[in-house]
Every structure is written in C-alpha cells, then in structure tokens.
C-alpha cells in the first residue's frame, strides 16, 4: 500500500477517536507531549545542528538560519506553548447559538473538529510542535509535511511528541510526519481528498501558490507578508522610528515583519534621513523610489518588482507618497492582505486607514509584529490566514473547527 495513503487511513481512524476525546484526555496528552519534548531536548538539538550545517553549506541567509535554529530556550518555549494550550477553552462541543422554530424544533449550531488536517510548511521546526498541539486540542488528527531543510529536526520533534500522545492513551497516529520531502509526494498529498479534510500551507509565496494551484483538497491560504508601515504627515517621529525598527529588524524572516515603508511627502525631507540612518545601524539595505534617492545617499533604486516582494531579510523598500489616499491605494495594490500599519496623531486619518485598507490586521500606532496568535490572546496559531473564506488573520483553536447543526424534536414530520 502507498505509504501516504496508509498515513491517510491511520489519520482518519485517529480522527474519529479524537472527535470524542474529552478535554481532560486532550490536555493530558498536551502535558505529556511537552514533557517528552524537554526529555529529548539534547537529541532534538543535535538533530537540528545537522540541519543547520546543511543549510550553511547551501549559503542560507542569516535570517533564514534563525528561523531554522533550535536551542534549549526555544524548546522550552515550544513546551510552554503546549502547556498554554491546556489552559485555553476547548471549543469542541460548544453550542454557538440555539433557537426554537414555530413547529417546536430546537435547532443548535455546534463546534466540531474538522477531522484530518494536512500542513505543508518550510524551514521552521517550531511549526511542527505548534501544529501538533493546536490540532490535537481542537480534536483533529494532523499529517505534517515539513521542508527538507528541517527534516532531521522535524523527525526528532515528532518522535518525542508521539511518545507523549501514546503515553496519554490517545491514538499514536493522531500526529504523523511525511519524511519524504520530495515535490512529488507533496503534490500527491495535495490531492488526498479521501483522507484530508483541509490543507494549510505555511511558507513563502512559492510554496503557498503551488499548494493553491495544485491542491484538490480544500486549502486555507496563509500568510505571505509584504507588510507596510505608512508614516503620516501628523506622525510622532520618535514613535514612528521605534515601530519601524521593531517591525523590520526584530525578526525579519517572519511574515509579520515590515517590508515596505511609505512616507508622506510633507515630512519626507525631515524624517527620511533619520529613519534611514537608524535602519543602516541595524544593517538594513535600503531600496527607494526616485524621490527617496534625491533625499538620501547610497539608496538602491527600487524596481516595480520590489513593491510586491516579500524580502524576509534585512532589506526594506521605501516610497514617498503624496497623501494618505495614495498610501492606501499603494497598499491595496501591492500588499498581500496580511498586516498594515499607519503612524499618525490624526484621528480622521487613522479611521480612514482602518476602514479602507484591505488586510487581515490593520494597525494604528503599533508594530505589525503583533499579528500573532499568542499576542492576540488566542494561544499559539496554526498560521495567519490572508484569505476571506472560513478564517482570516491568526488562526487559533476556533479556526480549526467547523460546525454542525443539532436538532431536537418530539415527533415533528414535514
């Protein structure tokens, strides 16, 4: 039997058990998963070092190496994330609403698991742990297909997590990893409709578009970034500088990092030299339009391709705009619908930006880096959805459920 189909069958069987697992059973599994992760930390870090060595040989960027890297602190954070899930409300079984019809029928809408979730992702081994924990708490089985860059790390993490699941008494096939990282296997997984109920890609634009174009399994499209910060003519310069530096440099290889800076022309000559100097102190390469190049020296000319590009690196594109309307128009044309921010002390401009920018998260006077399940109070997230169907924004436990109708009668016929 095809190995992928076997994993699908096992996941489907596990999903029927998880569907009816109690909150205490799922929480016990999460606690044990966290314990096993820490018990195996030396082994996991050793396997991660193999991935890092391979990545360095391939000339992987510093920012991408940071995404791939695991140490004791990050493993402790991953285990802590599993424990935080224990404290979150279990969405399964919640009756969202209920009403009574004139014929006496009582109709309720109840949260239930999706079933089997497939996740295709790239070089972030922490996703392995986050996805496993979230899916299990929401009563779903999960099949993971990580990138080749993190294969040793992922195998070690899944081995530890599965030990915890098995020890708790829940099905050991609640979590499975596809160890074959070939594109052919990924394409086959995208068409496994009989077993996978929904597919969630996490990674760069190339991966996400490949899944969207090739999958026959329903897809929830997640977060290519290209986030913008617009500095309005009535912005506080110190606040703007702090937000821009944080949004660009704290973790440049994540999807909620700032990639583009738009500056109102009325403040450009005063503000741009300051912010460009601050960015260069953080080793950020600055690319700008022709107007930016007139104000600042040693700026690389931005091309049309730059405006729609997610750099995931210490690079920023800067454009001078005439007013807030041009900023909004530019964002809605080139943005990915992820996270966008305005820095302003003008209330009317802040409201215009909130209402007219088409994105999952829109900020006034705050960093785009807050678009995150934990920061929003959801606990960990499975990804940031940039589409509008089913889920939008950080996807926590509720977004990993669907609904069914439950109807109580006393003999009604139609």
From Swiss-Prot:
Keyword vocabulary terms for this entry: Amino-acid biosynthesis, Cytoplasm, NADP, Oxidoreductase, Proline biosynthesis
Main location: cytoplasm
EC main group: oxidoreductase
Gene3D superfamilies: Aldehyde Dehydrogenase, Chain A, domain 1 (3.40.605.10), Aldehyde Dehydrogenase, Chain A, domain 2 (3.40.309.10)
GO molecular function: glutamate-5-semialdehyde dehydrogenase activity; NADP binding
UniProt entry tagged with the keyword tRNA processing: no
InterPro entries: Ald_DH/histidinol_DH, Ald_DH_C, Ald_DH_N, Aldehyde_DH_dom, G-glutamylP_reductase_CS, Glu-5-SA_DH, GPR_dom
A UniProt-annotated Pfam family: Aldedh
Pathway annotation from the record: Amino-acid biosynthesis; L-proline biosynthesis; L-glutamate 5-semialdehyde from L-glutamate: step 2/2
Record's subcellular location: Cytoplasm
UniProt GO BP: L-proline biosynthetic process
Coiled coil stretches, renumbered: none
EC number(s) from the headed UniProt entry: 1.2.1.41
Reactions that this protein is recorded to catalyse: L-glutamate 5-semialdehyde + phosphate + NADP(+) = L-glutamyl 5-phosphate + NADPH + H(+)
Assigned GO CC terms: cytoplasm
Protein's job: Catalyzes the NADPH-dependent reduction of L-glutamate 5-phosphate into L-glutamate 5-semialdehyde and phosphate. The product spontaneously undergoes cyclization to form 1-pyrroline-5-carboxylate.
Family to which this protein belongs: Belongs to the gamma-glutamyl phosphate reductase family.
Entries under HAMAP family matching the protein: ProA (MF_00412)
Name of the molecule in the record: Gamma-glutamyl phosphate reductase
């Amino acid at each position: 039997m095809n190995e992928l189909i076997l994993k699908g069958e096992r996941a489907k069987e596990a999903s029927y058990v998880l569907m009816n697992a109690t909150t205490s059973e799922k929480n016990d599994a999460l606690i044990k998963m966290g314990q096993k992760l820490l018990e195996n930390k030396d082994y996991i870090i050793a396997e991660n070092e193999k991935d890092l060595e391979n990545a360095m040989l391939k000339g992987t960027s510093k920012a991408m190496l940071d995404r791939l890297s695991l140490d004791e602190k990050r493993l402790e954070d991953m285990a802590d994330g599993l424990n935080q899930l224990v404290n979150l409300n279990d969405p399964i079984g919640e009756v969202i609403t209920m009403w009574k019809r004139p014929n006496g029928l009582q109709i309720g809408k109840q949260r239930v698991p999706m079933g089997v979730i497939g996740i295709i992702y790239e070089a972030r081994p922490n996703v392995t742990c986050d996805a496993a924990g979230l899916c299990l708490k929401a009563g779903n089985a999960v099949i993971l297909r990580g990138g080749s860059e993190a294969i040793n790390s992922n195998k070690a993490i899944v081995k530890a997590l599965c030990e915890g699941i098995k020890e708790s008494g829940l099905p050991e096939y609640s979590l499975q990893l596809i160890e074959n990282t070939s594109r052919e296997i990924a394409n086959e997984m995208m068409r496994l409709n009989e077993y996978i109920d929904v597919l969630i890609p996490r990674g760069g634009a190339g991966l996400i578009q490949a899944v969207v174009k090739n999958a026959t399994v329903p897809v929830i499209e997640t977060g290519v970034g290209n986030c913008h910060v617009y500095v309005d003519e009535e912005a506080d310069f110190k606040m703007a500088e702090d937000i821009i530096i944080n949004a660009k440099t704290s973790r440049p290889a994540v999807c909620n990092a700032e990639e583009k800076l738009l500056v109102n022309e009325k403040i450009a000559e005063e503000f741009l030299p300051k912010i460009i100097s601050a960015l260069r102190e953080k080793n950020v390469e600055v690319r700008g339009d022709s107007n930016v190049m007139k104000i600042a020296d040693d700026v690389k000319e931005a091309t049309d391709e730059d405006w729609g590009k997610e750099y995931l690196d210490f690079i920023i594109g800067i454009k001078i705009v005439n007013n807030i309307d041009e900023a909004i128009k530019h964002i809605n044309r080139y943005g990915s619908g992820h996270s966008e921010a305005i820095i302003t002390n003008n209330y009317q401009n802040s409201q215009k930006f909130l209402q007219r920018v088409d994105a999952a998260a829109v900020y006034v006077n705050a960093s785009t880096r807050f678009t995150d399940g934990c920061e929003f109070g959801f606990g960990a997230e499975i990804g940031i959805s940039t589409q509008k169907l089913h889920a939008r924004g950080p996807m926590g436990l509720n977004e990993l459920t669907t609904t069914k109708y439950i109807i109580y009668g006393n003999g009604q016929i139609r």
